[in-house]
UniProtKB/Swiss-Prot annotation:
The keyword Metal-binding applies. The modification N6-carboxylysine is found at residue 174. This is 2,3-diketo-5-methylthiopentyl-1-phosphate enolase. GO terms for biological process: carbon fixation; L-methionine salvage from methylthioadenosine. Gene3D superfamilies: Ribulose bisphosphate carboxylase, large subunit, C-terminal domain, RuBisCO large subunit, N-terminal domain. Keywords: Amino-acid biosynthesis, Isomerase, Magnesium, Metal-binding, Methionine biosynthesis. The active site is at residue 99. Homodimer. Belongs to the RuBisCO large chain family. Type IV subfamily. Pathway: Amino-acid biosynthesis; L-methionine biosynthesis via salvage pathway; L-methionine from S-methyl-5-thio-alpha-D-ribose 1-phosphate: step 3/6. Mg(2+) binds at residues 174, 176-177. It comes from Bacillus thuringiensis subsp. konkukian (strain 97-27). Catalyzes the enolization of 2,3-diketo-5-methylthiopentyl-1-phosphate (DK-MTP-1-P) into 2-hydroxy-3-keto-5-methylthiopentenyl-1-phosphate (HK-MTPenyl-1-P). InterPro entries: Diketo-Methiopentyl-P_enolase (IPR017717), RuBisCO (IPR033966), RuBisCO_lsu_C (IPR000685), RuBisCO_lsu_C_sf (IPR036376), RuBisCO_lsu_fd_N (IPR017443), RuBisCO_lsu_N_sf (IPR036422).
């Protein structure tokens, strides 16, 4: 294979999956086949999409009810020749799912890239090992927290929040994805002030924290804004990838003048992936494609919290981010939303140690503030790695957190 194989979930009311698959393969490549003269068939053969797999799935009454008709469900795989498209994500997505995405009854499940095609994508600049080297933390999950309530607040408020989170033992603090360029906390001011705070905490407490700053603006201004952030001392760039496009992420990741890790936020991705019947699967969108395009971190809804993904989907995202691939470094999985210390054993059990535990309210909502919240998480992480049940840990910060949010991990065995 020199091109790409697309895997689709299809719903066919004609109940002929093979015919439907062939129609898609032709419609997204040469348009027709059987009515072409033999000579023209020979000329176009190398451009023709080829159906390589058709698998019928069990009938699903809920799907029939939603679509208001009886359909046959199936998984099909189609190979698209590399000759048909340039080796970039806009061309690949348009080839494999462009007009097909308008069907409303087809979901793009996966894309399998040939080795030849993979060579055109950067992958993460730092990856898991590179991030761990920056922090000098190699033996546990990382802990990340989020600035909360920053809109309408000034630099002084940001510095106080950042200091408390860092003292609490948080490894990475990220901007809220809805914090854009503004008069009260402009980009470079946030970075310079944040670096001063984090250096002070490091000198006093010996704990290193990185700050992920949200790089925003018009598309054609992004590179310049990212370079301004780097020049000001940015540790990590947070990026709302799906408000801009995967190719924009790749452009940032490939730029040698932007030599910092990139953290991909999933904002807007639900518009592509939320439906079980159509769109693009979350593992492909938030896992494989983000990694190929250059994300060092991928945030996605956890299976446990307030905006939960099904566990199978979340684990599939993580698999795509972390599986061995000679072409790409591994990206950090960041299962997010509604995370509190009681979920830590679940996260480590399901995602392993190479994960970023990301919390907002679970840190800021602690009765002892963000310092207490961070310490509660760090204690929960250490206890879990020692296979010690959280309710047996004698720690006031963790005990307070479990009283507020509960301890659903009481029966978890690692």
């Amino acid at each position: 294979m020199s091109g790409i194989i697309a895997t689709y979930l299809i719903h066919d009311d004609s109940h002929n999956l093979e015919k439907k698959a062939e129609q898609i393969a032709l419609g997204l490549t040469i348009g027709s086949w059987t009515h072409l003269p033999h000579l023209l068939q020979e000329q176009l053969k190398q451009h023709k999409g080829n159906v390589v797999h058709v698998e019928e799935l069990a009938e699903h009454e809920h799907t029939n009810s939603y679509l208001r008709k009886k359909v046959k469900r199936g998984i099909i795989k189609i190979e698209y020749p590399l000759l048909n498209f340039s080796p970039d994500l806009p061309a690949i997505l348009t080839t494999t799912f462009g007009k097909l995405s308008l069907d409303g009854e087809v979901k793009l499940i996966d894309l399998t890239f040939s080795d030849e095609l993979k060579k055109h994508f950067p992958g993460p600049k730092f990856g898991i090992d590179g991030i761990r080297n920056l922090l000098q933390v190699h033996d546990r999950p990382l802990l990340m927290s989020i600035f909360k309530g920053m809109i309408g607040r000034n630099i002084g408020y940001l510095k106080t929040q950042l200091r408390d989170q860092a003292i609490g033992g948080v490894d990475i603090v990220k901007d809220d994805e809805i914090l854009f360029e503004n008069a009260l906390t402009p980009l470079t001011n946030r970075i310079v002030s944040g670096k001063e705070v984090l250096q002070s905490v490091y000198e006093t407490y010996g704990h290193k924290t990185l700050y992920a700053v949200n790089v925003t603006g018009r598309t054609f201004d992004l590179k310049e804004n990212a370079k301004r952030a780097v020049q000001a001392g940015a540790d990590i760039l947070l990026f709302n990838v799906f408000a801009y496009g995967l190719d924009v992420l790749q452009s940032l990741a490939e730029d040698d003048e932007i030599p910092v890790p990139i953290m991909a936020h999933p904002a807007v991705s639900g518009a592509y992936s939320a439906s079980k019947l159509y769109g693009i699967s979350s593992p492909l969108l938030l896992g494989k494609l983000l990694r190929y395009a250059g994300a060092d971190f991928s945030l996605f809804p956890s299976p446990y919290g307030s905006v939960a993904l099904e566990k199978e989907e979340a684990l599939a995202i993580s698999k795509y981010l972390t599986e061995d691939d000679v072409f790409f470094k591994k990206s950090f999985s960041v299962p997010s939303a509604g995370i509190h210390p009681g979920f830590v054993p679940f996260i480590i059990r399901d995602f392993g140690k190479d994960v970023v535990i990301n919390a907002g309210g679970g840190i800021h909502g602690h009765p002892n503030g963000a310092q207490g919240g961070g310490k509660a998480f760090r204690t929960a992480i250490d206890a879990t790695l020692q296979n010690k049940p959280l309710h047996e840990v004698d720690d006031i910060n963790l005990h307070s957190a479990l009283q507020i949010w509960g301890n659903p991990s009481h029966e978890v065995k690692l």
